[in-house]
Regions:
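Class I S-adenosyl-L-methionine
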Residues: 1-163
Length: 163
């Protein structure tokens, strides 16, 4: 069988170590601001290869292209979806489409039924976070803390995103 033929190349120690390295990288993002953290997580997933012919891990660039052109939200790429920076600055931009206000309303409920990497719900969650943080910024004239931001992301994950 094919499995027996390839089993000799499987080294459990390498597999375990690779998993440990990935977890360490992901944990190193914990102290970043949420928008930057989302971008770093997406970059990490970009290092993964499609595991087989039937499974396609949609790249972050494609997730941004599809969602920003349909529902709008927080786009992490330039207008051509080629770069995440422009003149040394993040290309992060809020995009409005015909349905953006309907999709990204405060009480919206987003159900992701086919999540493999979680990049689609990550895009939506970071967009909702961005909106709510901007509202908090306006309401408090810029006076809010990391604790306030933590509460926003927890609210988004609890009230708006379902996987």
């Amino acid at each position: 069988s094919d499995f027996k033929r390839f089993a000799k190349y499987y080294d459990p120690e390498v597999f375990v170590e690779a998993g440990r390295i990935i977890r360490q990288r992901a944990q190193s993002y914990d102290d970043l601001e949420y928008t930057e953290r989302a971008e770093k997580i997406a970059e990490l997933f970009g290092t993964f290869k499609n595991p087989d012919k039937e499974t396609v891990l949609t790249p972050w660039r494609v997730v941004n292209l599809q969602l920003s052109k349909t529902i709008g939200g927080l786009r992490y790429f330039d207008e051509n979806f080629e770069n995440t920076t422009l003149n040394g600055q993040d290309s992060i931009t809020w995009v409005e489409t015909e349905i953006t206000k309907e999709v990204f309303k405060p009480n919206t409920k987003i159900l992701e039924i086919n999540s493999k990497t979680g990049l689609y719900p990550l895009y939506v969650a970071s967009s909702l976070f961005h909106q709510k943080r901007n509202k908090l910024n306006d309401d408090r004239a810029g006076r809010f803390s990391k604790i306030d931001e933590d509460e926003i992301i927890q609210e988004v994950l609890k009230e708006n995103i379902y996987i």
